[in-house]
Amino acid sequence: MGKSPSSLDATIVAQAPCRVDLAGGTIDLWPLYLFHPGALTLNFAVNILTECRITPLRGKRIELRSLDTRKHEVFSSFDALMRARNYRLPLPARVIQFFAPKEGFLIETNSESPAGAGISGSSALMIAATAALARFTERHLTLEQMRVIAQNIEAQIINVPTGCQDYYPALYGGI
C-alpha cells in the first residue's frame, strides 16, 4: 500500500526529553536488581530535547541526517540500507531496519544533548525515532512496546545490556 499524494506532504515530528540520574543507575539491569531486593532508581526528565522528523519522499530513497552531529547518509532503497555493513548514523539506521518502511523518506534527528553528556541523549533519540517511525509505518504501539523496541535495538548497537530507566523519562517525562 503506497502513501497517498496528500500524505507525501505530512511531516512527522517526535520529541523526547533527556534525563538526569539521581540514584540507582544500572541497578535496573537484569539480573542485578535480583541481588538487591528493594533497590530503586531515581531520575527525572529535563527540558533538553531530542527530536526526530520524518518527511516522506517520492520513490524509495532513504536519507538520514543528524543536524547536531552534521552527519548524512543516503540509500537508494530500504534494501540498500539493509545491505550496508556500516552506518554513519547507526541508531536511526537500525530503527529503520526494524520498521522496514515501504516508501522513501528523509529522517532528520537533532539533539540538544551533546554526545557523551551522560543524560541519555541516545535513549531519547531511540524513543523519538521509534515513535516517529511507528507513526510513519502506521504501527500502533503502546509506550511500553516502544520502550522494549528502543532498548533492545540500542543494546544490540552498543553491545552492552541496557536498563529501562534511561527510556522512561523519554517516554513519560517527570520523575
PLM-predicted stretches and their roles:
Residues G2-G121, A131-L141, Y172-I175:
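ATP-binding N-lobe of GHMP and related small-molecule kinases
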Residues R88, M126, M146:
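Hydrophobic (often cysteine-bearing) scaffold residues that line and stabilize catalytic clefts
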Residues L143-I175:
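Alpha/beta catalytic cores of group-transfer enzymes, especially the acyltransferase/condensing modules
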